[in-house]
């Protein structure tokens, strides 16, 4: 593998600790290990829900009794609320990925926060939690910024209402220039107990997602891992 490609895979697949220091208060790994002592992996899926891809993901997770967290775009939740409810009914969690998949580097602070709040209202309606209720937009609500992009001021504001979840392993399934085999290889070479893995339940990622996810589940389950929601 050429040096530039190797560095790209190393930096993107597992973010360097410098990023942890630059974004204090974000969660980059999972909160705990199983009481049984079995290692845990936290699977997360960004950008859904959408027809075909998200139901397929739910089917794959069910085969392994795996729980996961879906960071959903509000507009997609409006289009496919039944898919999100199916995820909740199966014991998965739904987190906030903004309403319009906004980049924090290209959106004003107030507009970005309003966009996140709009998505959270929809999530609350799915959960049966009403705005203004004791659990509405609580500190236990989950948020992941699209593209992993944040500013310090936005991070400060978001942490008042959310756990801001980043990741420790990025599968890069969204990248059409990568082969499914390379995504799988880099992911399995990097993963370790407590990691938060990012997949994308999107049309763009479909070919790589459908190759990588079942193989990751099979490989890690064979090593005794459990799969938990955040």
Regions found by a protein language model. Give the residues of each.
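Helix-enriched interaction subdomains in cytosolic or periplasmic regions
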Residues: 1-14
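Active-site beta->alpha N-cap acidic-glycine motif
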Residues: 12-107, 111, 117-118, 122-129, ...
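Structural detector of well-ordered beta-strand residues that form the stable sheet scaffold
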Residues: 42, 69-71, 95, 144, ...
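Short histidine/acidic/glycine/proline-rich micro-motifs that form metal-
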Residues: 47, 72-77, 100-103, 149, ...
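Domain-start "cap" segments at the beginnings of catalytic or binding domains
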Residues: 120, 126-167
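His/Asp/Glu-enriched short active-site or ligand-binding loop at hydrolase and phosphoryl-transfer sites
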Residues: 149-190, 224-230
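Conserved nucleotide-state-sensing and coupling region of NTP-binding domains
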Residues: 220
